[in-house]
Amino acid sequence: MEKLKPNDVEKLEVIKDLVDQFIDLMLNYRQSGHPGGSRSKVHMFLSSLLSGYVRYDLRDPAKTFNDRIILAAGHTIPLVYSTLAVFNEAMRLRYEETKDERYLPKKPESTLYPKDLLNFRRRGGLPGHAEMGGKTLLLKFNTGPSGHGITASVGEAFALKRMGLNDVKVVVFEGDAGLTPGGAHETMNSAWALGLDNLFFLIDWNNFGIDDHPLTETVPNTPNEWFGSHNWRVVGTIKGNDFPDVFDVVNSLFTDIQKNIPNIAYFKTRKGRDYLKYDNKSHGAPHPMNSEIFWQTKIPF
């Protein structure tokens, strides 16, 4: 894939801004949820979905042979809800303009639109953690706790390989704190031992979980050592909130594949990017409803 052109970056920045606003408004209205990790993953999530490498059909997310997308950091589900709201609203508007039925969803009742964000974490509304169902059939596993989704990803990737479906990828989005459970190391070992070159991790390396101290005070080294010591192919950038750099890494992740070697890309970010509440303080803690600091976050937009 060619490098991003300036016009492409401008478009991605607009999409990112819209996703950011939906995350903020949804959580401020509900007064619950996780803004920090949701915001820090926006660049890598959008770059992956819009790269052309991840195969999915927005109109039919349950379609056979779609890539298996897993939000291992299931508590950052506001990221997915907000992204789907932007994408599906764009498709709806394009249909209104053109009347071209290619823009229509296969099942409107399973399509997430901006109005659905108002029912986040409410009875009958959008769940507080990632679920493979309802309006998020794009996702292929129910997740929430740290390390939960990454272990399941090995099972899915192995099953696909056994069925001969080597071109169906398992694409996993996780934060660095989600790699601290013991199951993460078993996952890394198993993925390499099973030759899962169809497995792709994208790691939000923001150096914070829920604790006051940075991750590096208890977990030494970097993603290069964490995964490289298990013989994974590692690529990454220290500019994880910069679209040109992120896109280059995504391009490398999905093209420079080595036979039987699992793949991981890391993106150095700031948890709570542009939310004016950072690091662990942004974990599970939206700004008070209609507070002055909340509206300060809207000024750049």
Give the predicted meaning of each segment.
Residues 37-41, 76, 242-249:
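Short, conserved alpha-helical segments within structured domains
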Residues 8, 16, 30, 172-173, ...:
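A short, structure-level motif marking secondary-structure boundaries and short turns
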Residues 10-17, 221:
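Alpha-helix N-cap/helix-start motif at coil-to-helix transitions, marked by capping-box chemistry
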Residues 35-36, 70, 264-267:
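A structural signal for short, well-ordered beta-strand segments and their strand-loop junctions
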Residues 134-301:
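Glycine-rich ThDP/TPP pyrophosphate-binding loop and its adjacent helix/strand module
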Residues 1-13:
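Non-catalytic, mobile gating and regulatory segments of ester bond hydrolases
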Residues 12, 23, 29, 39-194:
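Cofactor-binding active-site loop characterized by glycine-rich and histidine/acidic residues
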Residues 16-32, 204:
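N-terminal capping segment at the start of a domain
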